[in-house]
């Protein structure tokens, strides 16, 4: 059985910590949502595992959400159904209950990845769609120049796409998801062209890897990035990112058909 924190969180990060601000910073981006919707095909019943505050749940289908954190469940908007309190490793549903399943920015939190993937496959008749980060590419981001520890944590936590494919079996496609400029879903790479936003403590807290490093790392990051923005160093090296329409980072979409 997965070990859970006071608010029910079942991963290495305490999702009770960001409090009520998480959903302000992690709002689904419609351009990324369109990619997920396309991957779901004609599925009418969809399971969302690690659903959080409801990001990327399609509103034109029958969705069942699973989320272990009480804080995250409380932030679900009124137009979405309440989430079931459960973990990926022990889904309380019969075999083949859903046409499709999704999990977004969640697999790095699972305590037993093979068990969670087996459960997803067990309860899903059709495609399992996973939005995650490829650990092989996480450390290519400019944040490494200021807080490499954050990206090292992220790379260690994220399972490889190949491991996910092996765990799900069947026919699997893996594709890069381009991150749009002005992305409303505030994961770290979403700020590729808006570095000032990553000086916001609440923006950092909405990305769980930042909570898993020593506070001194955050202090150094904030001090050095702020200085480089003030004197133009960041823009001299990375300024082209401010107008880049889409950034090819570590974000990937995996679609596994049985």
Go through each PLM region and give its residues.
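Local beta-strand N-terminus motif with an aromatic residue
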Residues: 43, 98-99, 125
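A short SAM/SAH-binding and catalytic strip from SAM-dependent methyltransferases
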Residues: 99-114, 134
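Class I SAM-dependent methyltransferase SAM/SAH-binding core
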Residues: 45-91
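A short acidic, Gly/Pro-enriched loop at the edge of an enzyme's catalytic core
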Residues: 89-100
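Conserved Class I S-adenosyl-L-methionine
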Residues: 174-258
């Amino acid at each position: 059985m997965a070990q859970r924190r006071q608010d029910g969180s079942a991963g290495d990060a305490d999702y009770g910590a960001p409090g009520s601000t998480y959903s302000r910073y992690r709002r689904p981006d419609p351009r990324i949502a369109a990619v997920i919707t396309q991957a779901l095909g004609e599925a009418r019943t969809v399971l969302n595992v690690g659903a959080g505050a409801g990001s990327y749940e399609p509103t034109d289908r029958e969705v069942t959400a699973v989320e272990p954190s009480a804080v995250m469940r409380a932030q679900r908007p009124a137009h979405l159904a309440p989430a079931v309190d459960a973990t990926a490793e022990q889904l309380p549903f019969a075999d083949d209950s859903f046409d499709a399943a999704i999990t977004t920015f969640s697999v790095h939190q699972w305590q037993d990845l093979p068990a969670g993937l087996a459960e997803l496959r067990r309860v899903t008749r059709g495609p399992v769609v996973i939005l995650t980060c490829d650990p092989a590419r996480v450390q290519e981001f400019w944040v490494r120049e200021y807080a490499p520890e954050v990206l090292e944590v992220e790379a260690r936590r994220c399972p490889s796409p190949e491991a996910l494919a092996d765990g799900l079996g069947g026919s699997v496609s893996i594709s890069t998801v381009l991150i749009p400029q002005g992305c409303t879903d505030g994961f770290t790479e979403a700020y590729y062209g808006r570095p000032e936003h990553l000086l916001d403590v609440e923006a950092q807290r909405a990305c769980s890897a930042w909570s898993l490093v020593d506070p001194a790392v955050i202090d150094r990051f904030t001090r050095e990035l702020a200085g480089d923005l003030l004197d133009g160093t960041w823009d001299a090296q990375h300024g082209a990112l401010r107008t880049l329409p889409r950034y090819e980072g570590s974000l990937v979409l995996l679609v596994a058909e049985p």
